[in-house]
Amino acid sequence: VAEIEIGIGKSGRRGYSLDEVAISPSRRTRDADEVETSWQIDAYQFEIPVIAAPLDGVSSPATAIEMGRLGGAAAVHAEGLWCRYEDPTDVLAEIAELTTQRVSGQSGETEQIERMRQIYSAVVQPDLIARRVAQIRDGGATVCIAVTPASTESLLAHIVRAEPDLLVIHGTVTSAEHLTDGAHEPLDLKHLVRRLEVPVLVGGCASYQAALHLMRT
């Protein structure tokens, strides 16, 4: 992909969303029976190479169980609504309605953002983390719990105590080395991975080089 000049000494490459990408067959095709899609993380085997994103609009305990039945996995976020509310069904329905109202012009974006902040201001409950892990495990699926880098240290003890199978460190943009002015202590991924027995996945990197850097930790 050609690089584009974006400033003095700086360049970048055009990024594409999934909606803009089409997969076309090559000149040589292969019978489906001869294709192997299974993969493995530590001792955990999956039939399809898919882990559903740890977003409240994507992954729930029920989604994780169903994904496990289909051969994949789904990461439930320890800071999501499922670990803040006993039953977030009504809250999720309200969020969907807020989106509908904004699209139709019935409410503004400012009001929607403010209500979302109120909804997510509910405190994460450690007992709910343990219950979601147990719920997914009882459903027969591999338990995958996600947490943001900023909250990893504060929630780690509760997550480890719940005994998930996989831990995902998930951020909008995640790197192996974070520079700060010292006001906030950054998460040391290398140290974290080495002191945990649970396999750790890190998500939120947008390039091949960033992925390699993370894997070297």
Where in the sequence are the language-model features?
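Active-site entrance/lid segments in N-terminal catalytic domains of soluble metabolic enzymes
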Residues: 1-217
